[in-house]
């Protein structure tokens, strides 16, 4: 499917120079004083992992990879792989832990994730937008602390460090965004 350079977004997977590239940063739209407008795009090659900056004219059209998305349930770790099961057909697949990188610590047993495939090859794992985790370490509650904008550091059960409001204590469950690893709210 062709998309205009102005429509490129972070996370898009493009077919460029016969390779698959994922857009890794928000594209910068620039309108110089002289010359035509262009879009500066930082991309990462999905095969080699190399990064590249490309400049496309606003009038350019690029090929967006058509991906098939399926729901999978995470079962367990096997060496350097994740073992996941298709929720519809119950087929199991192994995928390298490297595909999740720093978000690996959010993965919990039986979690449902979305896997994007291109020509039956897994390219990307998408976690749920938020997860509920327990606070395992933080400073004690300060008397009189209210839900103001003052935050303290906390370490969650999976080892991730986040800033939480002063009134939260060890053992409480909180909602955390998986994309930027930030506190959302106390779990209900």
UniProtKB/Swiss-Prot annotation:
Record has Cytoplasm as a keyword: yes
Compartmental location: Cytoplasm
Pathway: Protein biosynthesis; polypeptide chain elongation
Gene3D superfamilies for the chain: 2.30.30.30, Nucleic acid-binding proteins (2.40.50.140)
Keywords assigned: Cytoplasm, Elongation factor, Protein biosynthesis
Function per UniProt: Involved in peptide bond synthesis. Stimulates efficient translation and peptide-bond synthesis on native or reconstituted 70S ribosomes in vitro. Probably functions indirectly by altering the affinity of the ribosome for aminoacyl-tRNA, thus increasing their reactivity as acceptors for peptidyl transferase.
Sequence similarity: Belongs to the elongation factor P family.
Xref: PANTHER family: ELONGATION FACTOR P, TRANSLATION ELONGATION FACTOR KOW-LIKE DOMAIN-CONTAINING PROTEIN
Name of the protein described by the UniProt record: Elongation factor P
Biological source species: Rickettsia rickettsii (strain Sheila Smith)
Recorded name of the encoding gene: efp
